[in-house]
């Protein structure tokens, strides 16, 4: 296989014309003949460059509104012919097929068309046919052809030519071929995913995923694991779309925890007041609403000050200077918010390692979406957990009715519990968590852990009693036995929200009545693993 191949003839046909003229001018200066089509040819000619229309080479005009223009043997023969195969070259000579050494194609903007909510027919018209066919042909024949599918690679092509006497090396062509195949695979995956949604196919026979490399990470969850961060192209506000104002590069764990924090805090409508969540290891260690952002932060912080050290903080509202100043009192890895004031940015500027992210908005917690989990030999796909419970959805199952404040706290705790690793127990008072038990194999153990954490914080804050006294509690799944409710009562809880559905519901309800608790069922579970 020949290593260095000279570039004598290029075919350029692009939708994204960023950097096109400068790139083509640099090729022309190296003596490269340029073939082109439609709008690309027009742009190049207007820039004063010499261009040969593909139609003049094929002897066949563009037709059917541009649907057919490069699907021709003269084009594909020029891309696929093996230069070291005598039969291939004889056939090319016989049919007057000239070789194409460089293919520059970026595809119709299908993904962008779908993202802006275009009509079905408009999306169909933005499915590229000729482009992917040429890209695949050129990539297959990378032994002799260089393929470019991304404007960010123009500079790399010119650098390769400069370093190799206007030739490209095999390693470079192989790299470009891999990029090309990844692009066509992602493009087809986008079309397939869109069409499945358009026809209401929830479990298509095949499902494909693709992402654009956003960041090569230093390591994964642990230093011995390699890692990278990819964006999927969606515009959902969050860590993938955020602007980083300062601080070190985000780590794998930073990204994972920041996503968990922002998705949680977005559950709380900013029109109803500020909310703050503090996260460690993808679990909340404090969540609160408040009269102001700083009030919400301080109340969330007071849930578990020890665990908050080195945590991730998310706000559902603009980060202001007062809140920023309060946050600087403890070591924090990342702060994410829809926006931040200039004063807040100035305060954080003194904390060089603190990462500040702004997103411009909040993700819609009710929006449909998919969640994935890899298992050995496959992966699981499910809808995003966007279940929401309102007061009207609750069923009171005990003799005692919850008070209005208890109902508000129950719904608040229920929302937080949705984002706590199972088994999850969340104690809340006055729209703030006061104890969280997470990730235990036994629900009663989570109940006891939440109580103990509240007692520890009460002692640290100099309080006479734990804040679980008089609290309302959420459980992400039903209580299989009465012991869980008995443990809640021992912690001083007064009201409980849970899905219900246990074969022992009657025993659990009887225990709640005996202990004077109010209990409501949601009929909805929030396991999180």
From Swiss-Prot:
EC number: 2.1.2.3, 3.5.4.10
Membrane spanning residue stretches: none
Organism superkingdom: Bacteria
Keyword terms, alphabetized: Hydrolase, Multifunctional enzyme, Purine biosynthesis, Transferase
Pathway(s) of this molecule: Purine metabolism; IMP biosynthesis via de novo pathway; 5-formamido-1-(5-phospho-D-ribosyl)imidazole-4-carboxamide from 5-amino-1-(5-phospho-D-ribosyl)imidazole-4-carboxamide (10-formyl THF route): step 1/1; Purine metabolism; IMP biosynthesis via de novo pathway; IMP from 5-formamido-1-(5-phospho-D-ribosyl)imidazole-4-carboxamide: step 1/1
Known catalytic reactions: (6R)-10-formyltetrahydrofolate + 5-amino-1-(5-phospho-beta-D-ribosyl)imidazole-4-carboxamide = 5-formamido-1-(5-phospho-D-ribosyl)imidazole-4-carboxamide + (6S)-5,6,7,8-tetrahydrofolate; IMP + H2O = 5-formamido-1-(5-phospho-D-ribosyl)imidazole-4-carboxamide
GO molecular function: IMP cyclohydrolase activity; phosphoribosylaminoimidazolecarboxamide formyltransferase activity
Domain MGS-like: 3-149
UniProt cross-references to InterPro entries, sorted A to Z: AICAR_Tfase_dup_dom_sf, Cytidine_deaminase-like, MGS-like_dom, MGS-like_dom_sf, PurH-like
A Pfam family of this chain: MGS
GO biological process, one term: 'de novo' IMP biosynthetic process
A GO term from the CC aspect: cytosol
This protein's domain notes: The IMP cyclohydrolase activity resides in the N-terminal region.
Family to which the UniProt record says this protein belongs: Belongs to the PurH family.
NCBIfam families in the record: PRK00881.1, purH
Name the record gives this protein: Bifunctional purine biosynthesis protein PurH
Organism: Paracoccus denitrificans (strain Pd 1222)
Gene: purH
């Amino acid at each position: 296989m020949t290593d260095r191949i000279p570039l004598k003839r290029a075919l350029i046909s692009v939708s994204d014309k960023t950097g096109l003229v400068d790139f083509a001018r640099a090729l022309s200066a190296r003596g490269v003949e340029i073939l082109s089509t439609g709008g690309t040819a027009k742009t190049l000619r207007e820039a004063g460059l010499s261009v040969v229309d593909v139609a003049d080479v094929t002897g066949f005009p563009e037709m059917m509104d541009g649907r057919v223009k490069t699907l021709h043997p003269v084009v594909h023969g020029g891309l696929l012919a093996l230069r070291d195969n005598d039969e291939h070259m004889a056939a090319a000579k016989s049919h007057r097929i000239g070789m194409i050494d460089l293919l520059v194609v970026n595809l119709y903007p299908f993904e962008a068309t779908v993202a802006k909510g275009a009509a079905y027919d408009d999306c169909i018209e933005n499915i590229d046919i000729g482009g992917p066919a040429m890209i695949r042909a050129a990539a297959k024949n990378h032994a002799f052809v260089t393929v470019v599918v991304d404007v960010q690679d123009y500079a790399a092509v010119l650098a390769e030519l400069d370093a190799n006497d206007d030739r490209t090396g095999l390693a470079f062509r192989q790299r470009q071929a891999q990029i090309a195949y990844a692009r066509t695979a992602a493009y087809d995956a986008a079309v397939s995913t869109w069409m499945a949604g358009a026809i209401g196919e929830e479990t298509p026979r095949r499902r494909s995923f693709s992402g654009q490399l956003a960041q090569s990470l230093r390591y994964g969850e642990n230093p011995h694991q390699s890692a990278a961060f990819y964006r999927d192209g969606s515009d959902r506000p969050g860590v993938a779309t955020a602007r980083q104002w300062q601080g070190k590069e985000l780590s794998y764990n930073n990204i994972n925890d920041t996503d968990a924090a922002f998705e949680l805090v977005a559950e709380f409508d900013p029109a109803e007041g500020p909310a703050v969540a503090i996260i460690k290891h993808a679990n909340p260690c404090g969540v609160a609403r408040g009269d102001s952002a700083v009030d919400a932060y301080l109340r969330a912080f007071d849930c578990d000050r020890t665990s908050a050290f080195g945590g991730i903080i998310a706000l559902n509202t603009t980060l202001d200077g007062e809140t920023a100043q309060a946050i600087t009192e403890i070591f924090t890895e990342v702060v994410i918010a829809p926006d931040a004031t200039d004063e807040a940015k100035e305060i954080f500027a003194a904390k060089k390692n603190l990462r500040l992210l702004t997103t411009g908005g909040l993700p819609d917690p009710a929006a449909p979406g998919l969640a994935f989990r890899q298992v050995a030999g496959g992966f699981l796909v499910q809808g995003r957990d966007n279940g929401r419970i309102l007061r009207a959805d609750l069923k009171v199952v005990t003799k005692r009715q919850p008070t209005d404040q208890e109902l508000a706290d129950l719904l608040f705790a229920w929302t937080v519990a949705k984002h706590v690793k199972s088994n999850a127990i969340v104690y809340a008072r006055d729209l703030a968590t006061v104890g969280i038990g997470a990730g235990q194999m036994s629900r009663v153990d989570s109940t006891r852990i939440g109580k103990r954490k509240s007692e520890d914080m009460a002692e640290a804050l100099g309080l006479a009693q734990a804040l679980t006294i008089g609290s309302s509690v959420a459980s992400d799944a039903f209580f299989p036995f009465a012991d869980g409710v008995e443990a809640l009562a021992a912690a001083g809880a007064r009201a409980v929200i849970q899905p219900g559905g246990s074969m022992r519901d009657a025993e659990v309800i009887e225990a709640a009545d005996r202990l004077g608790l109010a209990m409501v069922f949601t009929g909805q579970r929030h396991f999180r693993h």
